[in-house]
């Protein structure tokens, strides 16, 4: 749980950097297997934004930053710029979680600073790895990110890599060439669909022309009687 909780703080920071400081927490779930983070944002994130957030969190993990837990007065924490959850009720004494940019950081060198009573790691490197599983809508104006860390991230990467290798085997190509092979197959399917549509049109016209040969004139009126299958 500590791994996913500390990763949640890093994710919150990354969303502020990539989207805006209005991407504030609107709910979260921290479990031993994964994390879920809801935040305010009017539209879905682009694949590029998701990639940037994921990269930023992993860079913070690799930076091996210290995570400091301190209990202090609510007024003091607010004066220092600690981030508080909107609508949350706090007592006069609160617990703060600071992720420092280095072991020698001062108050002004905090990478992340939030009010939080949960359990956390001692250093960001203990997160191990961070991988976003999905990003989608949780409610109107609220987005949701689900992610895994540590062993969970490793296992998901292994699962996806296995799928990629199986796909490469089916396509009879190398792992690096899978995207190009898929693009080529999509182009081929698109062309085949066009050819099929053209053949259907030609067949329909040919059938119609054959039927015209059976037109009979009844009292100066051209009549065509035919049985149409289906």
Q: Where are the model-predicted features located?
A:
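Secondary-structure capping and boundary motifs in well-ordered enzyme cores
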Residues: 2-3, 7, 45, 137, ...
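Feature representing long, continuous alpha-helical segments
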Residues: 5-8, 13, 17, 51, ...
């Amino acid at each position: 749980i500590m791994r996913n909780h500390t990763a949640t703080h890093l994710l919150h920071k990354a969303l502020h950097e990539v989207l805006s400081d209005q991407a504030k927490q609107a709910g979260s779930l921290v479990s031993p297997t994964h994390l879920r983070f809801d935040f305010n944002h009017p539209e879905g994130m682009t694949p590029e934004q998701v990639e940037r957030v994921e990269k930023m969190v992993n860079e913070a993990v690799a930076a091996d930053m210290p995570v400091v837990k301190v209990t202090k007065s609510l007024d003091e924490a607010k004066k220092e710029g600690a981030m508080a959850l909107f609508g949350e009720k706090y007592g006069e004494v609160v617990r703060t979680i600071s992720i420092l940019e280095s072991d020698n950081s001062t108050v002004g060198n905090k990478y992340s600073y939030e009010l939080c009573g949960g359990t956390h790691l001692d250093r960001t490197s203990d997160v191990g790895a961070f991988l976003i599983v999905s990003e989608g809508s949780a409610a109107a104006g609220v987005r949701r990110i689900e992610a895994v860390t540590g062993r969970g991230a490793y296992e998901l990467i292994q699962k996806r890599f296995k799928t990629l290798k199986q796909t490469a085997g089916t396509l009879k190509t190398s792992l690096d060439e899978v995207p190009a092979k898929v693009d080529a197959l999509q182009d081929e399917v698109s062309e085949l669909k066009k050819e099929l549509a053209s053949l259907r049109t030609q067949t329909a016209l040919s059938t119609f022309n054959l039927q015209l040969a059976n037109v009979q004139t009844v009292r100066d009126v051209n009549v065509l009687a035919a049985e149409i299958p289906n």
